[in-house]
Amino acid sequence: MIKSELVQRIAEHNPHLYQRDVENIVNAILDEIVAALARGDRVELRGFGAFSVKHRPARAGRNPRTGAHVPVDQKSVPFFKTGKEMRERLNRDTGAPDSGA
């Protein structure tokens, strides 16, 4: 599902809202999550999961084509950890065994 499909589905389930208003709300939520992560904050949505930033140290990499060693700079990457309720629902709905993670 892409963002436009998400907006459309939310608008269909909430006929009292205009689709452009739903799109503005979804964009505002996503913008706030990104802004919080950029500040170094953790964003927790109970039952859904938590967004955070993980910092990867600089390391030596390898060019797969030439085999030459190349330095890889340190970087920050977004990380998402699913909430307990989401994990339970996904495992219940798919019939997959609970990994306990």
UniProtKB/Swiss-Prot annotation:
Family designation: Belongs to the bacterial histone-like protein family.
Assembly information from the UniProt record: Heterodimer of an alpha and a beta chain.
Biased composition (Basic and acidic residues): 82-92
GO BP field: DNA recombination; regulation of DNA-templated transcription; regulation of translation
Entry protein name: Integration host factor subunit beta
Highest rank taxon of the organism: Bacteria
Keywords for the protein's UniProt record, in alphabetical order: DNA recombination, DNA-binding, Transcription, Transcription regulation, Translation regulation
Stored CDD domains: IHF_B (cd13836)
Matches recorded under InterPro entries: Hist_DNA-bd, Histone-like_DNA-bd_CS, IHF-like_DNA-bd_dom_sf, IHF_beta
Positions of region (Disordered): 58-101
A cellular-component GO term for this protein: chromosome
Protein task: This protein is one of the two subunits of integration host factor, a specific DNA-binding protein that functions in genetic recombination as well as in transcriptional and translational control.
Gene Ontology molecular function: any one: structural constituent of chromatin
